Amino acid sequence: MAEKVNVCIVGSGNWGSAIAKIVGANAAALPEFEERVTMFVYEEMIDGKKLTEIINETHENVKYLKGHKLPTNVVAVPDLVEAAKNADILIFVVPHQFIPNFCKQLLGKIKPNAIAISLIKGFDKAEGGGIDLISHIITRHLKIPCAVLMGANLANEVAEGNFCETTIGCTDKKYGKVLRDLFQANHFRVVVVEDAEAVEVCGALKNIVACGAGFVDGLKLGDNTKAAVIRLGLMEMIRFVDVFYPGSKLSTFFESCGVADLITTCYGGRNRRVSEAFVTSGKTIEDLEKEMLNGQKLQGPPTAEEVNYMLKNKGLEDKFPLFTAIHKICTNQLKPKDLIDCIRNHPEHM
């Protein structure tokens, strides 16, 4: 890429806006990048004014990242194709349910030699059973390579500039450097690995475990029980990758995308928080999303459903009792208090 690299961020929620702070600053500071970074923003009206206009005038996403200034070179664009058409790097950071539709809109409208990177923690149901990784959907639809970025990265803490690490999974070494340059900052340290599938699967599965941690918090079962749920969750994550994505490295689970992300999400993430409220309030997950998340969606429950679909197809539900129980609690087939009985005789204990 001899010419300057154009960057587009597809998405402007809490995490998309937080990452825009880093990407915008790096694009402005580093000579290999075009300074102007476009950010696709789903248009909404806030107090009678368009959200894109507010962002471009005040350099703040007042809906999803209030109190944090975005770099002035990050430009909000309400039209997806317009935002993405000149991009050499497309950063996807939207709820995973939107990806197939967005890809359809972008097909044939982007540079043929562009690359993508997905920051999306979740996956889709494949036709005929199984799981479709978001990076695979993007590559299949857009005919471009897609890396992934996952880690212990709570959006508000990243926006505050607190130190953290992240993992980029990139199977093609030639893209590793430009992606690291784009995301690396003093407070946001990047490790690039080639085991992209395991990196991405970790990012999705940990949201299921975080729901379990939230149920434990809501039931006031204490730190020992929560630690057991986190450990069993990690073991099921490793086993899941082993079964469905053989050839992944165990060492990947010890990167930020694995155990670190699992810990932070089970103590600080929205999946944990809403799951705790699900136990204590008796309200539905849908109602709690509206109340607590400002219209944003949880990734844990739909991911648990997609994973359960896959496990059921292979007759493996009993080998993953934690994932199975969390799915059943999220869909009201079990009560939260039944969680511990479901994992008391975990295969790990046999």
UniProtKB/Swiss-Prot annotation:
Catalysed reactions, as listed in the record: sn-glycerol 3-phosphate + NAD(+) = dihydroxyacetone phosphate + NADH + H(+)
Entry keyword Zinc: no
EC supergroup of this enzyme: oxidoreductase
Active site per the UniProt annotation: K206 (proton acceptor)
Positions that bind substrate: K121, R270, N271
Gene Ontology BP terms: carbohydrate metabolic process; glycerol-3-phosphate catabolic process; glycerophospholipid metabolic process
One Gene Ontology cellular component annotation held by this UniProt entry: cytosol
Binding residues annotated for NAD(+), in chain numbering: G11, S12, G13, N14, W15, G16, F98, K121, A155, R270, Q299
The protein's annotated pathway: Phospholipid metabolism; alpha-glycerophosphate cycle
GO MF terms, alphabetically ordered: glycerol-3-phosphate dehydrogenase (NAD+) activity; NAD binding; protein homodimerization activity
Taxonomy, superkingdom: Eukaryota
Keywords: Cytoplasm, NAD, Oxidoreductase
Subunit structure: Homodimer.
Family of the protein in this entry: Belongs to the NAD-dependent glycerol-3-phosphate dehydrogenase family.
Name under which the protein is recorded: Glycerol-3-phosphate dehydrogenase [NAD(+)], cytoplasmic
Species classification: Eukaryota, Metazoa, Ecdysozoa, Arthropoda, Hexapoda
